[in-house]
C-alpha cells in the first residue's frame, strides 16, 4: 500500500441523538467532537439521527400500508 493516501481507521463513537443511544465501532469518518467513553478513554464523536434503536423497522413501530386496498379504490374510482 502507498503510504499517506489511506484514511485513518480508528475507533469512533456514534451517538443517536433521537434515542439517546451510543455505540463504539471502527470507522474512517472525520469527527470534530470527542467524548469520554465508559472505558475512560476519549474517542471521536459522530452524531447520527437514525440507528437501530430509533428506526421504525427495528423498533417494531413500523406502519404497514394496505396497498391492495388502495389499488382497488383507484380501480373502482376510475372504472378500470
Swiss-Prot record:
User: Domain of life of the organism in this record?
Assistant: Bacteria
Q: Which Gene Ontology terms of cellular component type are present?
A: ribonucleoprotein complex; ribosome
Pfam families reported in the protein's UniProt record: Ribosomal_L31
Q: Which UniProt keywords apply?
A: Ribonucleoprotein, Ribosomal protein
Q: Name one GO molecular function term.
A: structural constituent of ribosome
Annotated InterPro entries: Ribosomal_bL28/bL31-like_sf, Ribosomal_bL31, Ribosomal_bL31_B, Ribosomal_bL31_sf
BP term (GO), one: translation
Q: How does it assemble?
A: Part of the 50S ribosomal subunit.
The record, for PANTHER family, names: 50S RIBOSOMAL PROTEIN L31, CHLOROPLASTIC, LARGE RIBOSOMAL SUBUNIT PROTEIN BL31C
User: Can you tell me which family this protein belongs to?
Assistant: Belongs to the bacterial ribosomal protein bL31 family. Type B subfamily.
Q: Please state what the protein is called.
A: Large ribosomal subunit protein bL31B
Which species expresses this protein natively? Methylobacillus flagellatus (strain ATCC 51484 / DSM 6875 / VKM B-1610 / KT)
Amino acid at each position: 500500500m502507498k503510504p499517506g493516501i489511506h484514511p485513518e481507521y480508528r475507533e469512533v463513537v456514534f451517538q443517536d441523538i433521537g434515542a439517546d443511544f451510543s455505540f463504539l465501532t471502527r470507522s474512517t469518518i472525520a469527527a470534530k467532537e470527542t467524548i469520554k467513553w465508559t472505558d475512560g478513554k476519549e474517542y471521536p464523536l459522530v452524531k447520527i439521527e437514525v440507528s437501530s434503536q430509533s428506526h421504525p423497522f427495528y423498533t417494531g413501530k413500523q406502519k404497514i400500508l394496505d396497498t391492495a386496498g388502495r389499488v382497488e379504490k383507484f380501480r373502482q374510482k376510475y372504472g378500470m
